[in-house]
Amino acid sequence: RQPYHYRNKVQAAFYTDKKGKIISGVYQSGSHHVVGIDSCQTEDVIADKIIVAVRKLLPSFRMTTYNEDTGKGFLRHILVKRGFATNQIMLVLVTGTPVFPSKNNFVKAILKQFPEITTIVQNINPYRTNLVLGDNQKVLYGKGYIEDILCGCRFRISPKSFYQINPVQTEVLYGKAIEFANLKGNE
């Protein structure tokens, strides 16, 4: 019943400011302005660290960030999902183009820092849209999904899958629903 760092899905937008500084975080309400965030009390700690590490790697791989106003650039968003019970970690790199220069070296570099990542997926979103994920994706490392266990059931989680972001409280809520349903076994 942890009130902190419970979000097992974390996403960040990327932007390069006028001074050339790469920022990762969330959009300011009603704008394309990215507010920089390195960590958040509700987000998974490892997910936050992965996002910061990717941001720091971008210049060495000459990767540009996507500009919402011009529709140009490479990296749009990052999505990190972690299985609460399994500790499996998925890194999704949302790009504006399918071409991913130095992808193998980039994958090696991020895995060197975070060997606990079990899969890395490139999701391609070339459209000028507010939707984070595009229709197409490529598995760069691992199986392209993670698994987690919730209420004794195993779930396979893909980049586009909906999955409860707070599994501990979800199990409490589902348990209460079952209790209040007062099931007898012959329904």
Locate each region found by the language model.
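Accessory RNA-recognition modules of RNA-modification enzymes
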Residues: 1-187
